[in-house]
Design a protein with these regions (language model features):
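Bacterial N-terminal signal peptides that target proteins for export
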Residues: 1-8
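Cleavable N-terminal signal peptides
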Residues: 9-10, 20
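Sec/Tat signal peptide C-region and signal peptidase I cleavage site
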Residues: 16-22
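Exported/periplasmic ABC-transporter solute-binding proteins
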Residues: 23-142
């Protein structure tokens, strides 16, 4: 009986994890950002890899990430940046020697949302299950 119960619990966890991935992501920006939407995945990747540092109006882009252990960040890294966490860490190590720092990290989707609401020029990502209140949705990632 115990192995069967364990199998059922494991299946439920996998289904829930899969549904979180299936939700997709919203790429959100501070309401002050004036940019043609939707942004392409290439543009978003360039922002997060610090290849684009300013918005079209000349204001600074301030990208914000989830913590490295977040499922939302894993989905973003694999889907948008097309890298795994190890490759991305190696990329940031290289840029560190050029004096560049990775994006700011927030511990929850609500914290990302609050950061983007309050920091001019900021851009972040949240799952589609979070209401994007007070921000501009600049792209949707399936």
């Amino acid at each position: 009986m115990a192995p069967r119960l364990l199998a059922i619990a494991a299946t439920a966890v996998l289904l829930l994890a899969g549904s979180a991935r299936a939700d997709g992501l919203l790429i959100i920006a501070n309401s002050s950002v004036n940019v043609a939407t939707p942004l392409s995945l290439g543009q978003i990747a360039a922002i997060y890899l610090l290849r684009i540092a300013t918005w079209p109006d000349g204001s600074h882009v301030v990208p914000v990430n989830r913590e490295a252990t977040s499922q939302t960040r894993e989905t973003f890294t694999m889907t948008v940046l097309q890298q795994d966490n190890t490759s991305l860490a190696a990329y940031w190590n290289e840029l560190h020697f050029m004096g560049k720092q990775p994006p700011v990290v927030q511990e929850s989707e609500q914290a990302v949302l609050a950061f983007v609401q309050n920091v001019p020029g900021s851009i972040g990502y949240i799952s589609t299950s979070v209401a994007p209140v007070g921000v501009k949705v600049v792209a949707r990632v399936p």
